[in-house]
Amino acid sequence: MKKQLLLAGAALTLGLAGCSDDVTENLSNPIQTGEEIVFGSTINNGEYQKANGIQTKTIYAERIDHGIPVLWDPEGDEIAIVCPQALGNTKRADYLVKPDTTTTNWNQSGSVAKLDPSQTLKWGEEDAHKFFAFYPQNASILKDYAIEGENVNFTISLPATQNPTGWHTKTDENTQETTIYEIPNMDYALMWAYNKVYKSKLQGKSIDLDFKNFVTVLDITIPGPKNEHDAVTINNIVISPTDQSQQLTGDFKATIIPPSPTAHHDIASMKLSTPTPNEAHRQISISCVNKDNQGITLKHNEKLVIKAYLCPKIENYNLDTEKINLSFRISTNKETLTINHVPTHITNSKVNRILLPNIKP
């Protein structure tokens, strides 16, 4: 078995600014308490051209050397931003971000609009403001949040059934190898961000909110049969740890903790709770049936690529690598194939590639 670590290659960045009128070069325009906090945004992908007609960020398929590009969804991506220092009772606002479709690179936003016009984050009286952001703001995944002192607590629900939203096929012109990519549900690709800014120092400058991966992602490749005359139709894939005490998904609480005032950095930390015990969350099920209720047929010189989203390592939220033995049950039109004890070294909160052996007909 082979496994390759792939760092997630995109940091979602939001720029914030205060409302301001036109001013001359000799005048300053400090942000005033009560002004609305206005958002603009970018995804830091570097240069990335739209390829193969893919016009959505709900796909990881186009792998590049240094990571996986991410684009804004043309129909909009929903994010939540929390600011405990915001004026009044409104401490959270949800936004719809859309790309600038007039450009070739869709990492630039064309618009950032409030989902609820009544939600308005306003600059508070304090100079320092702390911003906590979440993607997605989907209520079925990001269930709730609470401000407790300097921290923000939230509850995450990561489902055991992780069906794709569609499929994308690409053929390599040189090798003629065809890859069938799952288009995953990006609601499972949870991210978070934190930053602290000072009103007195802002004055028109943008504020970066660099999103970090929250969940751990398995990028799984299943090669087709070795014999050129064989084919296998895959209907469903179930992933489970061989150690039944391990839980891959479920409901769990997390806390974003800003650095202490004496810290020599401004990097927030994360504290996680143990997921609520649930037998069903000890495995992940991924359907490979298309919209016509047909399974994915995998031939010789073809391969299938799917994603699975796991809870991050609970004991110590960091980028440590841990070893986990996984079992894969692949349901085909003929039988259920089981691949046991696949030793996998997983780096927490990153995209980890796993290559399985050729599927047998």
What are these regions (language model features)?
Residues 3-8, 16-361:
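Sec-type signal peptide cleavage vicinity
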